[in-house]
């Protein structure tokens, strides 16, 4: 296992491991751009399996002021080296009073599901780009994605984590969505 970047070990979110890539160059398909295929390597198609909450049409979701502030903060600070989505999203959440812990992005989903500042909803993965600002999207781990992925929707079809990119809609694993209350 690689040690990651200096200064990342020992913190709640650091752990010394790059999130989403495991330290292996090219292992993280979301570095440098969103995956566009079916996940490759026999990975399952993206789905809402494992998500709880009602199914919703993201076009009908009213955003919140708190969600807009969270998205603005995440976008302003999305300047990481790549591969550290959980660290950067965790820092943005922490600045807004929400703490998540663990070594991998997918671990944030169960914590957000229990947090009173969020409500979980089911959203068709192809519609994730329509989410309001501040929605947190958590992709599960799977083949080629040992840590999963987490991001904060910016409300314009883009997401922020350690980088700003088009909202990922096909990661090859199941997805859970959390809306700020």
Q: Model-found features: residue ranges?
A:
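Short, low-complexity, Pro/Ser/Thr/Gly-rich segments in the mature regions of secreted, periplasmic
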Residues: 169-181
């Amino acid at each position: 296992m690689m040690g990651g970047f200096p200064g990342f070990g020992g913190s709640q979110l650091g752990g010394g491991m790059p999130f989403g890539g495991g330290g292996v160059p090219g292992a993280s398909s979301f570095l440098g751009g969103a995956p566009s295929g079916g996940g490759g390597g026999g990975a399952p198609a993206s789905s809402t399996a494992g998500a709880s909450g009602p199914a919703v049409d993201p076009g009908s979701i009213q955003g919140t002021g708190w969600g807009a502030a969270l998205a603005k903060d995440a976008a302003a600070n999305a300047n990481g080296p790549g591969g550290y989505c959980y660290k950067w999203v965790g820092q943005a959440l922490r600045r807004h009073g929400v703490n998540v812990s663990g070594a991998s992005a997918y671990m944030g989903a169960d914590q957000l599901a229990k947090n009173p500042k969020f409500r979980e909803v089911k959203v068709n993965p192809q519609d994730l780009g329509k989410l309001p600002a501040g929605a947190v999207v958590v992709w599960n781990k799977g083949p080629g994605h040992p840590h999963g992925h987490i991001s904060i929707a910016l409300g314009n079809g883009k997401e922020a984590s350690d980088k700003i990119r088009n909202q990922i809609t096909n990661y090859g694993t199941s997805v859970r969505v959390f809306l700020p209350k």
